[in-house]
């Protein structure tokens, strides 16, 4: 069928080189680099382009990095089959090409390049408002109870959706034809809706057409920014702690490159009625359970009224710290902010210990904020918190016998616990109450 593949042995990073392929004819590729390739996947916050971030004009003007290459994958979805190729091309990073490229991906790649000084390739694989089920293959979905139910229901749901779409289209077409016959030229001609299998929210549809084509391609790792679309119910957010590990393990299986680093963004602060505390907890649990995952905490750089925060520079920077630590094994890197370790109750106080304290704990404001404490009645009160000997002591005069503490357990919390490397603590809770 004219398809073939050549696998080259690993070579020293560098370039540009020329690649010659000779058979009955010859093909020459020039300006080829050898370096590390990262997949940049997720929904709209991964897709958000450089032109929409804070200070975009200055960022774009200074984006001259010939050793960074950018590849944007075309939007295409199919639940029923995979494809082997995508539409797109490698572009040299400059002010023209970076303008519409993933901001998180670019800032991540830029920070990496500055630190390791090898060519960096970034593959932008984003689609707004998409849920994790669309990015996960059927095999992995079957490992999760909620995913298994979707896989088993898909044939009927797809058929029903397509039939409903045709009924609606035919009804709209009759109305349109009637209007035209009566001389009404204001109505727009109806269009057929997308078949269910082509819907980017359908199971495995984005994995099949946007991820699978790269599974034979050598990569260093993945960065992932997604979760908003899976936070519309508490159960969906809780299920994510099964979906995310299942997706990660299946991608690693399909790439056949071992347990490559998978780095993701924990959702930031944002005022909404979604279930972001539970989603952040699902992400935290995934991070703690898999040593080759990294999590960039962003609880301090979201925006109260905008689900697409403008500060993507710090997101990329924090992901790059995870990469330098996990993927490149750089010594002396503090890649993470404080992560809750344990709680000890002494009289009316809860004493909290943390991992990843770096050079020590500190508050970004005069007094620690974001902590709540509860007794056996499960009623949480705002707490007074202070840093004492590398631990956090939490107290409230309303709680004489504390049993649980929560930190940042809101959609849009005010949080101030950091390490001295200025990396924020992840939100957490010590209880498991519903």
Task: Outline where the language-model segments fall.
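Cell-envelope and extracellular/periplasmic
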Residues: 1-434
């Amino acid at each position: 069928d004219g398809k073939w593949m050549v696998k080259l042995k690993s070579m020293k990073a560098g370039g540009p080189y020329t690649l010659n392929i000779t058979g009955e004819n010859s093909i020459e590729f020039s300006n080829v680099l050898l370096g590390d390739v990262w997949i940049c996947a997720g929904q709209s916050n991964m897709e958000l382009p450089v032109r929409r971030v804070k200070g975009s004009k200055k960022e774009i003007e200074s984006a001259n990095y010939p050793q960074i290459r950018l590849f944007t994958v075309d939007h295409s979805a199919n639940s029923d089959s995979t494809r082997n190729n995508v539409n797109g091309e490698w572009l040299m990073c400059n002010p023209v090409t970076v303008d519409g490229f993933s901001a998180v991906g670019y800032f991540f790649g830029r920070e990496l390049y500055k630190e390791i000084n090898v060519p960096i390739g970034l593959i932008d694989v984003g689609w707004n408002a998409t849920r994790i089920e669309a990015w996960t293959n059927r095999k992995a979905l079957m490992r999760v109870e909620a995913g298994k139910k979707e896989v088993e229901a898909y044939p009927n749901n797809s058929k029903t959706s397509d039939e409903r779409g045709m009924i609606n289209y035919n009804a709209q077409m009759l109305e349109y034809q009637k209007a035209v016959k009566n001389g009404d030229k204001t109505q727009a001609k109806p269009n057929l809706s997308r078949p269910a299998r082509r819907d980017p929210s359908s199971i495995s549809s984005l994995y099949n057409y946007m991820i699978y084509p790269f599974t034979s391609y050598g990569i260093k790792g993945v960065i992932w920014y997604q979760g908003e679309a899976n936070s519309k119910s508490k159960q969906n957010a809780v299920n994510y702690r099964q979906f995310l590990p299942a997706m990660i393990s299946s991608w690693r299986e399909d790439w056949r490159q071992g347990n490559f680093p998978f780095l993701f963004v924990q959702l930031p602060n944002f005022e909404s009625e979604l279930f972001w505390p539970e989603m952040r907890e699902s992400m935290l649990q995934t991070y703690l359970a898999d040593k080759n995952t990294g999590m960039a905490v962003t609880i301090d750089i979201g925006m109260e009224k905008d689900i697409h925060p403008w500060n993507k520079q710090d997101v990329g920077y924090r992901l790059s710290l995870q990469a330098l630590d996990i993927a490149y094994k750089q010594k002396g890197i503090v890649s993470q902010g404080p992560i809750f370790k344990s709680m000890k109750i002494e009289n009316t106080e809860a004493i909290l210990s943390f991992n990843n304290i770096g050079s020590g704990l500190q508050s970004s404001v005069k007094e620690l904020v974001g902590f709540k404490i509860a007794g056996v009645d499960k009623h949480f009160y705002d707490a007074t918190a202070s840093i004492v000997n590398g631990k956090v002591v939490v107290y409230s005069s309303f709680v004489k016998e504390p049993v649980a503490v929560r930190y940042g357990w809101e959609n849009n919390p005010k949080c101030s616990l950091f390490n001295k490397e200025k990396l924020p603590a992840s939100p957490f809770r010590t209880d498991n109450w519903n």
